[in-house]
Amino acid sequence: MSSRRLGRLLSKLGVKRGAASASARAAAVPDAHLYRPLFSPWFGEGEFQRYFAMAAPRTLVSADRCHVLYTLLEQAFHIEGNVWECGVYKGGTAAMMAALISDRCPAKRLFLFDTFEGMPETNAAKDRHRKGDFADTALESVAAYVGHGALCVFRKGFIPDSFAGLEAERIAFAHIDVDIYQSILDCLHFIWPRLSLGGFVVFDDYGFSSCPGARAAVDEFFLGKPCRPLCLPTGQAVVFKGVSAP
């Protein structure tokens, strides 16, 4: 059948040629429903959704950002060292990561750092958050939600004081979600020298206008270093510690 005759037939059936073509193109694209407009696998029904369901009730971290954590954490399982999260809040992303570690790499430990009483003093010139923000949490509640017993090591207190005694630690993956300039700098000064080659640091707040101090701290720390932050459209930034990185 010629294209002209097919067009007339479709017209009689009430189907416009453009709509038919669009439908055919969509059918030819695997997982077409996940293009919104770009491929967005965190909307799918795969394994990630099971882990994200653990995070969702108790986190402000969106599905696309959790998918970044999930994907990079899996890739860090073969790297020497443990997993750190600085800025736990109500424990949503901690619960997701603890479950993933328990299932895939139970030899690793998840270190969790937070005041569990809200933010410390902030820098008024660099930060929009203020002391006491995110105080609606408590260590006991978070620990009960995250679970996984000895796999999780909770360190309550201010950063960097809560890092005391961990100088010999090796780190494979770190999630830094503390929002404010000085705390992020303090995290980096301690974590970066202990991050194993091939390891990742994910900064949750880098690209958000609500956290200008986050980007300022990250950019300042990595200025002149061979490793540079990769800014993602999720608002996060990722730094990979390459083979030659100091």
Tell what function each PLM region has.
Residues 35-63, 70, 77-246:
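S-adenosylmethionine/decaboxylated-SAM
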